[in-house]
Amino acid sequence: MPGYSKEDGNILKQFGAAVKAGRDGLGISQETLAEKAGPHRTYVGGVEQGRRNVSLLNIVKLSQALGVEAASVFEHMKTIKILKIIKWIYLAVIMIFVF
């Protein structure tokens, strides 16, 4: 991701995944979320793909459009990270027993 460290890029991707999970949970399109939150649909797509560094105002607007507190989006990011760690542990255990 140009201009961002790998760690920063991962944060943006995790935030985007949290927004996408919230949107999917509501069963709404990127366009509908954009209409509710204010930014353009392509901006929402960029956020979900981890390509946009989201401002504090847009974090609040997206959260409100999803019907959640902004803090809950960050809590979801922790869950995503924990699930990735569990996945890597699982794969490591499989590798140990297979090889």
Residue ranges and their predicted role:
Residues P2-G25:
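A short, Lys/Arg-rich alpha-helix, primarily the initiator
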Residues A17-K36, K61:
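Short basic helix-loop element that most often maps to the first helix and adjoining turn
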Residues V19, L33-A34, V44-V47, V73:
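Conserved hydrophobic/aromatic packing and binding residues within compact polymer-binding modules
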Residues D24, G38, Q49, V60, ...:
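Residue-level detection of the helix-turn-helix DNA-binding "recognition helix"
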Residues G38-V54:
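Recognition helix of helix-turn-helix/homeodomain-like DNA-binding domains
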Residues S55-S72:
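DNA major-groove recognition helix of helix-turn-helix/homeodomain DNA-binding modules
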